[in-house]
């Protein structure tokens, strides 16, 4: 609940902030950094873009794609196809050894159940790679998330790989991308 409150607080701050002040703050944070920065905040009354030079640049999402996975899962919950209380069985073989996973640390022997709401929390709030891949398995894979995003009007966004495959080759991270458009 605390995390949800913080999220809504951040959304409120963004929606109330002045665009010029926000650009100034972003510039202050990013100046002198060797980084490609593109920020986009979309809202009914608050469209905002920073650094239009990078607007069309395909940026790897890396762990940010876990948010998109959560959206696709929650859409299936809204449709009544899944339930947040629904338990999902996690096999020991899914607890990949060389990846970040608080789930694996908590349950090293595998073969246990977690609710969808717990998997979302671990995936989004703790960036758990195992939880992410379990959610993707549950809903049918990265293509389901990609198709969901396209159906909601997302443009210039692509999700091809789960965490396991994204980490198997350096170049794969660039196939899960988005732009600020």
For each feature predicted by the language model, list its residue ranges.
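Soluble periplasmic/extracytoplasmic beta-strand elements of cell-envelope proteins
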Residues: 38-42, 68, 89, 134
């Amino acid at each position: 609940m605390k995390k949800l409150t913080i999220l809504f607080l951040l959304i409120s701050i963004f929606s109330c902030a002045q665009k010029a002040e926000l650009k100034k703050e972003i510039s202050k944070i990013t100046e002198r950094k060797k980084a490609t920065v593109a920020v986009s905040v979309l809202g009914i009354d608050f469209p905002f873009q920073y650094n239009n030079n990078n607007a069309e640049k395909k940026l790897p999402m890396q762990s940010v794609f876990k948010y998109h996975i959560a959206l696709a899962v929650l859409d299936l919950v809204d449709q009544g196809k899944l339930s947040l209380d629904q338990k999902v069985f996690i096999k020991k073989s899914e607890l990949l050894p060389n990846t970040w996973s608080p789930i694996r640390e908590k349950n090293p022997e595998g073969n246990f159940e977690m609710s969808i709401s717990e998997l979302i929390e671990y995936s989004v709030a703790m960036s758990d790679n195992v939880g992410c891949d379990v959610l993707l398995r549950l809903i049918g894979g990265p293509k389901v998330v990609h198709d969901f995003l396209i159906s909601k009007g997302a443009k210039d966004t692509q999700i091809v790989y789960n965490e396991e495959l994204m980490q198997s080759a350096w170049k794969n991270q660039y196939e899960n991308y988005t732009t600020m458009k």
